[in-house]
Curated annotation (Swiss-Prot):
Belongs to the UPF0597 family. Pfam families: SDH_alpha. HAMAP family: UPF0597. This is UPF0597 protein YhaM. One of its GO terms (molecular function) is L-cysteine desulfhydrase activity. GO terms for biological process: L-cysteine catabolic process to pyruvate.
Length: 436
């Protein structure tokens, strides 16, 4: 719990980070459906015999090609089945952390028997939507999640409505901590990072602990596309230099390899995404280690990275056609620039160069190849920092980048929020045609 005597704005920053930076086991879109199924199963009278689920097109996109931890299988059906048969309804994004070998076997058997179906919800105006309905004979329970990966808005059984969330904030309720980010600036975030007591932000070191463990697993195992392990081998062969730049890419992509390959270790997520959490964490950790930073400097750099990533992502839809590893890496660029230089000008220049570099990267669903995009984003972030240290950056005379970094961020987010909606529909259409 943080010090209540802190500046109220700083309290809201800390609350925003605590809300958005959480442990998550498995890719968060399938996990969101697994959570809905687990909560529904907890409400059901008797064991689950059948599972029906409906998801938004975006959630379907991000669930088609990703491995569910511990199962060796990809896709939403196994996530729904395992959530229903082995999920911990009280564990949030770690819903599958207690799944046993027997539960996994039972989930696969349920799937093989044709007792699990997952369809796109039509019509669906929500970007993030999952609904799971579980059956025992004629008895059933249904749970709906909307807007956020763990935001349960409705629980119903054959006996009637158990819970429904109010659509709006009523008088006397506090607004979401994220709301304050729409009224803040990067300069204010930097002031907070520089001046907040270390004790109030020490908790962010947990992101380094979790994501470093995931990175180590990625280097030691044959996970996903094993990009990190492959690049490390090429260093040993002399085909790639073993330096700070390659270490950033190797250790960051290794964590994503393990994450997307189905390792049973949690990631510390950011904005509902494990890969965003990895991208906001690992480059900063590697640079901090290179410079021998102590825990306090690491915590401040991680707080700047994670809060900047949240600040940018708060201007985006929760899921979109824009690969959000890029925006998380903008946070990482801020954190790395702070470690090396500390000046606002260096941080803002690095972010501007990132927007001029990787802003066109699309999200074509969660899969092993996400680690490729994570590695690209991490590399671009360090390149942008190196440019900024030499007083060089993409300027407001070029493309969507503006002279002011805040406007550059707004321009990027406007593209993702509006113009790229058709891109998203085309991506989903292509992926759906492959699945048929």
């Amino acid at each position: 719990m943080f010090d209540s005597t802190l500046n109220p704005l700083w309290q809201r920053y800390i609350l925003a980070v605590q809300e958005e930076v959480k442990p998550a086991l498995g890719c968060t879109e399938p996990i969101s459906l697994a959570l809905a199924a687990a909560v529904a199963a907890a409400e059901l009278e008797g064991p689950v015999e059948r599972v029906e689920a409906w998801v938004s097109p975006n959630l379907m996109k991000n669930g088609l090609g990703v491995t569910v931890p511990g199962t060796g299988m990809v896709g939403l059906p196994i996530a729904a089945a395992l959530g229903a048969l082995g999920g911990n309804a009280n564990a949030g994004l770690e819903v599958l952390k207690d799944a046993t070998a027997q539960a996994i076997s039972d989930a696969k058997a349920l799937l093989a028997a044709g007792k699990v179906s997952v369809k796109i919800q039509e019509p669906c105006d929500e970007i993030l939507f999952s609904r799971a309905k579980v059956w025992n004979g004629e008895k059933w329970a249904c749970v709906t999640i909307v807007g956020g990966h763990t935001n349960i808005v409705h629980i119903e059984t054959h006996n009637g409505v158990v819970f429904t969330q109010q659509a709006c904030v009523t008088e006397g309720e506090q607004e979401s901590p994220l709301t304050v980010l729409s009224r803040t600036t990067l300069a204010e975030i930097l002031k907070f990072v520089n001046e907040v007591p270390f004790a109030a932000i020490r908790f962010i070191l947990d992101s380094a602990k979790l994501n470093c463990a995931l990175s180590q697993e990625g280097l030691s195992g044959n996970w996903g596309l094993h990009i990190g392990a492959t690049l490390e081998k090429q260093c040993a062969r002399g085909l790639l230099a073993k330096d700070l730049s390659s270490s950033i890419v190797i250790r960051t992509s290794a964590a994503s390899d393990a994450r997307m390959g189905g390792a049973t270790l949690p990631a510390m997520s950011n904005s509902g995404s494990g890969n965003q959490g990895i991208t906001a964490t690992m480059p900063v950790v590697v640079v901090a280690e290179h410079f021998g930073a102590d825990d306090e400097r690491l915590a401040r750099a991680l707080m700047l990275s994670h809060l900047s990533a949240i600040y940018i992502h708060n201007q985006l839809p929760r899921l979109s056609a824009l690969c959000a590893a890029t925006t998380a890496a903008m946070g990482a660029a801020a954190g790395m620039a702070w470690l090396v230089d500390g000046r606002y000008e260096t941080i803002s220049m690095a972010i501007s160069s990132m927007i001029g570099d990787v802003s066109g990267m699309i999200c074509d669903g969660a899969s092993n190849s996400c680690a490729m995009k994570v590695s690209t984003s991490a590399s671009a972030a360090w390149k942008a920092v190196l440019m900024a240290l030499d007083d060089t950056a993409v300027t407001g005379n070029e493309g969507i980048v503006a002279h002011d970094v805040e406007q550059s961020i707004a321009n990027l987010c406007a593209l993702a929020s509006h113009s790229m909606q058709q891109t998203d529909r085309q991506i989903i259409e292509i992926m759906a045609s492959k699945a048929r």
